[in-house]
């Protein structure tokens, strides 16, 4: 995901400044798209990309900033992100599902929405140990090393007691996610050593996707406050 911050300041004819946020700014923004490959067909300053407001996803406040979820597309409407294809896929599913329902004589349903509740698995590593491993720092996973003294052969970690340090991290994580409207519901150890999981309540697909991006970001920030590092790679260690 990405961010672009705009202030609400707007100059007046008298040389003063007022706080203003227009509907035009809300509906469409114009960030830079020069980092996308163009084959050298256009100059950097002409590489326009446009943000389009996604009114179906909730706005939220993060670090005293109003965050408005948007899609990112080119001047011609081509998708420059992964959210635009998702929204179009949801519309396509709705159209075809409605068509099938009408074939069966169902005229009561007016919209079909998909929902998802993505579980987010993660590993917690002590910051001091993490700093000793350059492969973890640069790759987010180990590239070499000895086998661990304990693997995931038994169920003692999955069904074991959550360690106090991890429990404190989970409590702070839930608090921060709830502030952002992310409905974190379930947390527990996972099978591999140092692996844990957070599961939210199911919600509409595009909202759940936005929430999952927020979850991963907040996980890493909260972990740092507890002297930990959150690894989001699905298999950061060999044999996991």
Locations of the language-model features?
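Glycine-rich, acidic/polar active-site loops that bind/position phosphate-bearing ligands
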Residues: 1-232, 239-240
């Amino acid at each position: 995901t990405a961010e672009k911050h705009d202030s609400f300041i707007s100059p007046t004819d008298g040389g003063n400044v007022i706080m203003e946020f227009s509907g035009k700014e809300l509906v469409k923004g114009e960030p830079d798209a020069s980092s996308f490959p163009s084959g050298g067909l256009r100059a950097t300053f002409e590489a326009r990309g446009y943000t389009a407001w996604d009114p179906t996803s909730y706005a939220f406040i993060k670090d005293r900033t109003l965050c408005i979820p948007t899609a990112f597309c080119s001047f011609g409407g081509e998708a420059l992100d992964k959210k635009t294809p998702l929204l179009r896929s949801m519309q396509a599913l709705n159209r075809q599902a409605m068509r099938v329902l009408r074939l069966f004589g169902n005229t009561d349903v007016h919209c079909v929405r998909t929902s998802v509740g993505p579980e987010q698995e993660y590993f917690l590593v002590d910051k001091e140990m993490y700093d000793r491993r350059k492969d973890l720092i640069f790759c987010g996973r180990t590239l070499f090393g000895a086998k661990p003294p304990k693997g995931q052969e038994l169920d003692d970690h999955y069904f074991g007691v959550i360690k106090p340090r991890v429990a404190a991290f989970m409590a702070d994580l839930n608090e921060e996610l709830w502030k952002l409207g992310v409905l974190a519901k379930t947390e527990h150890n996972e099978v591999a050593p140092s692996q844990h999981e957070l599961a939210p309540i199911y919600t509409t697909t595009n909202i759940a996707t936005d929430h999952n991006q927020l979850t991963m970001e907040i996980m890493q920030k909260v972990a740092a406050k507890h002297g930990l590092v959150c690894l989001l790679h699905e298999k950061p260690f060999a044999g996991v």
